[in-house]
A protein has these predicted regions:
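A mobile "lid/hinge" subdomain adjacent to the ATP/sugar-phosphate binding pocket shared
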Residues: 67-129
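Phosphate-binding/catalytic loop of phosphoryl-transfer enzymes
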Residues: 1-74
């Protein structure tokens, strides 16, 4: 995906870029001097298993508080669902708590959806920095 973005997308005029993808997991593709950077072990872009919350949720890798426990679609959906069940108000319906619905609500100014997306963004930013 980082190569496609480098050749055809927003970073095509950049020699160095990082594409971070949040989906089922969290990963990064790194372009350095116009070439994909893989690293010695081939896992340099595996940012999803960097521990960002030592007392956080258990990750499927066995560790606690990995970035993926915060910044992956399922984690975002679960966080919003838990908050809705606690009684927080939102445009996101309890029976349709999907990443698509959450993002649409955030774009329309929903305070709960926006707060969760902001929370995710802050953790992504700290990890990348």
């Amino acid at each position: 995906l980082a190569l496609a973005e480098h050749y055809f997308g927003a970073s095509q005029d950049c020699e160095d870029s990082i594409l971070v993808r949040v989906h089922r997991g969290t990963g990064a593709g790194i372009i350095s001097n116009g070439r994909i950077f893989i690293g010695r072990n081939g896992n340099v872009g595996e940012i999803g298993h960097i521990q960002v919350e030592p007392l956080g949720e258990r990750c499927h890798c066995g560790n606690f508080g990995c970035l993926e426990t915060i910044a992956a679609n399922a984690a975002i959906e679960q966080r919003v669902l838990n908050l809705l069940k606690q009684g927080y108000q939102s445009r996101v319906p309890l029976d349709d708590c999907t990443i698509k619905t959450i993002c649409k609500a955030a774009n329309k100014g929903d305070s709960l959806a926006s707060a969760v997306i902001d929370y995710v963004g802050r953790h992504l930013g700290k990890t990348i920095a």
